[in-house]
Each structure stands twice: as C-alpha cells, then as structure tokens.
C-alpha cells in the first residue's frame, strides 16, 4: 500500500513525500514520488503523525456490557488512536499475575489496536514484578477490591523501586472529611466532596516520599501522575521536578479537565461526573498553559464507558467516568486551531511524549511497523456520539463544533477510516 501526497510530521518538521507500506505492515520506503504497482491511497496533503497513544483507558474487561477489547479498540481506530494502555481496576482487579495474563490473552485475541496493560499495586503485592506490564498503577483512594493504598505510610517502600508508577492522586482522608460536611444531593456536591484539596494533598503525600527516596536511596522510580486537574498540583509538581536528582516525574491531563469546569456541572449532569471531578475555569487555563510550557507531558482520555441508563441516574447512583478515546484527537487539534497550543505541542502530548514515557515505538521510520494517525487539521465538524464505535454512545462534547479531525488510522500497516471521514 502506498500513501500518496503525505505531509509527514517528523522531528518537529513537516516533510512532504509518500509512504510505502509492505505486505508485513512495515514502512518500506519514505520518499517523494514513489512509483509502485500497488494499492494507492491519495491522502491529499493531510498530515501524517506518529500513531497517537492514549495512555489511560478502561476497556472494561469483565464488564462487557459497558465495553470490551473489540468495541474499545474499534473506538480507538475511529478516534485516530493506534495504541492504548488499559487500567487494572477491573472486576476482579488485576492484582495477580494469573489475572493479568488472563486479561492479556483476551486483549491479544480481541483488540484491533495495540493495547498494553497496567498492573494494579496493593499493600501486599507491591514488591512483585510482571514482565509484560507497561506500568504499575497506584490508587490513593478506594477503587475495586484491594486495589487501593489505604496506609499512606507504606508509600515510601512501594515507590522505592526502579519501576514506572501511574498514580491516581486523590487523598482519601480529605474526601472522608468532606463526606462529613456535604451530602451528595447535587452535581456540584460531587466536586465539593472530591475537591481541589484532595488532589493537592495526595500530590504532596507522594512528593514527600519521593524526596526521602531521592535523598536516601539509589533507586530511580518514575512517577507518572494521572489526570492532574488543578493548577496548584501542577505547580507543586513543576517545583519538585527541579529539585529531584534521581527521580523522574511526568504529568497527564485529560481533555475534559481542559474544556469543562464547575460552572457546567448542573447542565452536564451525569455526563460531567468523573474522578477527579470538574474544577474551576482557572484550572482549565492552567492546564493549557502547562501544555505550552511543557509542565504537562501528555494528554490521555481516561476513557471510562458506562451504560447510558446508568449515566442518566441521579447523582447518588450515577457512576463516575465518560468515554473519551474517540474525542481525544479532535479536542486536542481544536486547541491548535484556537491558537492555544501549537501543532507540535499537540503531537508532543499525543504521540511523542507517551512513546518516551511508556517505551512504545511509534516512530515514522523505514523498517518500523506502520502505526500512523492521519489528520485533517482544517476539517470542521460536530462531535456526534451516535457515530461512536464505543458501546458508550454519549459524551459531554456531543454536538460541539470543533476543527481538526483524524481521517485515517493505520494499525500495523492496515488502513482504516477514522471519525473525520464520517462527520
């Protein structure tokens, strides 16, 4: 297959040329005016970027009514996503090797995109290693079963390892105190209970332990903070990054924490209920600035599908989480078209940095498997949840006019139409 008339993003430059993909799905040649007797796809000067990596998804293994590896991966293709990293808070949680490899087997059998798995850290299993785990996930607040670090005094020992840890940073004690003050009667109450302080104090707790490890240990953990949502937490992480010598810290944010805020809580209802919750407008602005000044390393969707009937329930019975793998690319490109970030910022947080952090090869180079996201930066259209391939056909962004869409997704050399071809 020959991709004709490409504008290829490589090393912060745009290169014009063609991409020839061989029968094994590998990039055989990148050059101008390639002549070949093969299938030719004229992509008409669209941009070809290294395959987008969504480093935070929940494909709901064990809860197939909500999503499964097939539907989740088809949603990824539709959204221009070539790689995804699935979280371990399943039912049952992925806290043993046996469950990990059972889940991995199902993933390899059913997924149409490249999916990796994180392993769940508990107070009892933290010294174990799982060779095929992409990272180790720590929940600082109640999750599923024993997938939760309840005793924060154990964090130092847990983090004192040469591992990549992904941390859900919400402080259990702050949330428990807030539960004494607030009743969950309105959508804004969800934001009050899991308030900004809960994230900030959790980040402080992790930082305190990392400083001790940095001073006293020769271990070099890498801590990746998932879905940071507040300007204060972002500032604390920026500050400590400059102080630590042997420890790497990276930061992830989501499109919903960039675009949505508390002012929208009552209007969005269940479609605005997720963890961490809606924040302030100032936090939206801080996250965008964080992308530009590189305090934010990646954007991930935290794709968390639920049954629509459950998301339409009242605030007490509505589960937290929204689908996002099909909107992550257009919402990020929309920031480019609004002049809030550059095209190269977008590629850095969607492709380049996730590849570095999680050791994923998505480079557009001869000999590599062709995992490519092809985008039309100028295409305008509406986000239409009815066109989603996810089982969760709803979104807080449904009906939003945005500019910039994925039009094709190439997975290991196979080309698929993406959402931008349909909207």
Swiss-Prot record:
Could you cite one Gene Ontology molecular function of this protein? zinc ion binding
Q: Does the keyword Ion transport apply?
A: no
Q: Hey, which pathway is this one from?
A: Pyrimidine metabolism; UMP biosynthesis via de novo pathway; (S)-dihydroorotate from bicarbonate: step 3/3
Active site residues of this protein: 302
List this protein's GO terms for biological process: 'de novo' UMP biosynthetic process; purine nucleobase catabolic process
UniProt keyword Metal-binding, yes or no: yes
User: Which cofactor does the UniProt annotation name?
Assistant: Zn(2+)
Residue positions where N6-carboxylysine is found in the record: 137
Q: Indicate which residues the UniProt annotation says bind Zn(2+) 1.
A: 56, 58, 137, 302
Cofactor mode of binding and number, as noted = Binds 2 Zn(2+) ions per subunit.
Reactions mediated catalytically: (S)-dihydroorotate + H2O = N-carbamoyl-L-aspartate + H(+)
The record's listing under InterPro entries reads:
Amidohydro-rel (IPR006680), DHOase (IPR004722), DHOase/Allantoinase_Hydrolase (IPR050138), Dihydroorotase_CS (IPR002195), Metal-dep_hydrolase_composite (IPR011059), Metal_Hydrolase (IPR032466)
List cellular component terms (GO).
cytoplasm
Which amino acids does the record list as binding substrate? 58-60, 89, 306
Where, in this chain's numbering, is Zn(2+) 2 bound? 137, 168, 227
Sorted alphabetically, the keyword list is: Hydrolase, Metal-binding, Pyrimidine biosynthesis, Zinc
Q: Which NCBIfam families match?
A: pyrC_multi
Q: Which family does it belong to?
A: Belongs to the metallo-dependent hydrolases superfamily. DHOase family. Class I DHOase subfamily.
Function of this protein?
Answer: Catalyzes the reversible cyclization of carbamoyl aspartate to dihydroorotate.
- Specify the protein name: Dihydroorotase
Species of origin reads: Methanocaldococcus jannaschii (strain ATCC 43067 / DSM 2661 / JAL-1 / JCM 10045 / NBRC 100440) (Methanococcus jannaschii)
